[in-house]
């Protein structure tokens, strides 16, 4: 039997989640690799799926969980064999396909990455899509020319999963990190992660209305979007760029073209869903090499499947700090 957290939709369109045992025959056949899932995690997108928001889930009943890691049970694909430790994220797993909140899953070989040496399944889910996206953003910004001597790098929404990991990784690479948060009580936490100073959300929302401001940021990892992203664009230095990856502060913004014309700034869209396998492997290897395990452990908390629904709401309410690891067998 397979233990799974299943979300159902009622006749009035409300959704509810419950833990059930299902037969292996009830698991959708989404690919040639069968995985015994050990760990998953909780991201903002998981919170949306658990609560029937964002039009992400197409059909019910549904198993959310956009991340998973475990051991291959069987494989009909070249290059992946029974016993391999693997992780899977992206490609709409947990959204339009059943995801990681179950003890079994399957997927196509091109969605699955064998874990680098020294990275356990639990370690990988302390990172999950959040850590993956943080490293992806840094590599993209550096490919665009960002360097540690090019000025401070702003991380917005720094208390969340992506922001927390990005703060650690940037500081480890020698950047001066300004961490923006709306929660003053986590300032010490962000400083411990490597932030050189704290910027309040209110400060970033206090927009003077000018089309362009003094150049402050050599780069930015923006996890929130909305008018905060518009403000960041005004404050980028010449040739600076912002990696845009979230919309918790809004999906639209009112921005001027002046910084693009006079400073040559860039907005780099970060799509972690459809990254090709070679690049996915590169990102996971970089995470294994650079993210300190002790720091990651300190910023992570483990829960069981029975707590996932509650934490899905908490992450939407901005009440989750750092990373949440889900032990699907717990």
Protein language model features and the residues they cover:
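Glycine-rich beta-strand-centered segment in the early N-terminal region that forms part
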Residues: 26-42, 53-93
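Glycine-rich NAD(P) Rossmann-fold beta1-alpha1 loop
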Residues: 131, 157-164, 225
């Amino acid at each position: 039997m397979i233990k799974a957290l299943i979300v159902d939709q009622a006749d009035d369109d409300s959704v509810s989640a419950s833990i059930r045992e299902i037969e292996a025959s009830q698991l959708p056949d989404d690919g040639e690799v069968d995985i015994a899932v050990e760990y998953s995690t909780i991201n903002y997108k998981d919170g949306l799926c658990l609560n029937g928001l964002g039009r992400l889930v197409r059909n019910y009943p549904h198993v959310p969980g956009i991340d998973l890691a475990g051991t291959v049970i069987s494989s009909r694909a070249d290059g992946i064999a029974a016993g391999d430790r693997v992780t899977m994220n992206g490609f709409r797993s947990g959204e339009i396909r059943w995801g990681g909140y179950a003890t079994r899953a399957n997927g196509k070989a091109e969605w699955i990455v064998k874990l680098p040496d020294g990275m356990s399944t639990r370690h990988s889910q302390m990172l999950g899509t959040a850590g993956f996206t943080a490293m992806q953003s840094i590599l993209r910004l550096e490919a665009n020319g960002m360097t540690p001597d090019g000025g401070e790098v702003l991380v917005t929404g720094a208390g969340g999963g992506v922001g927390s990991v990005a703060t650690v990784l940037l500081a480890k690479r020698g950047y001066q990190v300004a961490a923006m948060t709306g929660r003053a009580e986590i300032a010490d936490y962000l400083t411990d992660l490597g932030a050189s100073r704290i910027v309040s959300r209110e400060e970033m929302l206090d927009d003077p209305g000018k089309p362009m401001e003094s150049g402050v940021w050599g780069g930015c990892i923006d996890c929130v979007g909305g008018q905060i992203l518009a403000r960041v664009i005004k404050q980028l230095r010449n040739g600076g760029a912002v990696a845009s990856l979230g919309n918790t502060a809004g999906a639209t913004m009112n921005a001027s073209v002046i910084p693009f014309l006079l400073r040559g700034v860039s907005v780099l869209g970060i799509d972690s869903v459809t990254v090709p396998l070679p690049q996915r492997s590169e990102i996971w290897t970089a995470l294994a090499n650079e993210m300190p395990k002790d720091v990651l452990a300190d910023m992570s908390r483990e829960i069981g499947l029975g707590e996932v629904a509650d934490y899905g709401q908490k992450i939407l309410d901005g009440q989750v700090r750092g990373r949440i690891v889900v032990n699907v067998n717990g």
